[in-house]
């Protein structure tokens, strides 16, 4: 077995491969793969992300092929800020970014960090929500905005960025 890889078996007997890495005494799962080579490649990509300071959020796409974008963001945040979150969160000065996808960055105040660290944001038909104890809550509800509210009429984004959910950027009109 190659470094960072171990085999496992599904209930139907199919063999698959798990990749993991240990960094600063933290054991991190990198995912499941159908081949040992893919799992080892994911391990090598993770090593590169954690060791190479030249890799940033701006050039990360050229560095990953086997790792998911979410996992790569988690690893970069752990390397740069020494905090590991299971969700794709990257800490900034005074706020944090939550990457819903590789082209959708949501910005939040640092006050909301531990809420979103424990709740995965999902998007369905343009609506952003989190699941909490079986219920789905719009992320706008944290700002007192009703589910039926309309942007521009019931609430505004001061800087025009509809992905910037910092409290100073949202004006709740109704």
Label every model-predicted segment.
Residues 1-31, 78-174:
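Short, Arg/Lys-rich segments that mark the N-terminal edge of DNA/RNA- and chromatin-recognition modules
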Residues 19, 39-47:
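An aromatic-rich alpha-helical recognition segment common to small helix-rich domains
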Residues 53-85:
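Intrinsically disordered, low-complexity charged/polar segments
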Residues 33-36:
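Conserved aromatic
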């Amino acid at each position: 077995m190659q470094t960072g890889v171990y085999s496992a078996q599904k209930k139907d007997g199919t063999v698959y491969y798990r990749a993991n890495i240990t960094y600063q005494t933290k054991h991190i799962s990198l995912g499941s793969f159908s081949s040992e080579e893919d799992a080892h490649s994911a391990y090598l990509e993770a090593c590169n992300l954690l060791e190479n300071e030249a890799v940033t959020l701006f050039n990360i796409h050229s560095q990953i092929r086997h790792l998911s974008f979410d996992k790569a963001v988690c690893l970069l945040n752990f390397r740069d800020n020494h905090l590991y979150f299971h969700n794709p969160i990257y800490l900034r000065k005074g706020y944090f970014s939550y990457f819903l996808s590789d082209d959708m960055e949501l910005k939040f105040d640092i006050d909301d960090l531990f809420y979103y660290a424990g709740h995965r944001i999902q998007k369905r038909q343009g609506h952003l929500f989190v699941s909490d104890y079986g219920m789905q809550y719009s992320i706008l509800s944290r700002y007192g905005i009703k589910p039926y509210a309309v942007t521009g009429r019931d609430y505004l984004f001061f800087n025009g960025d509809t992905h910037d959910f910092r409290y100073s950027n949202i004006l709740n009109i109704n």
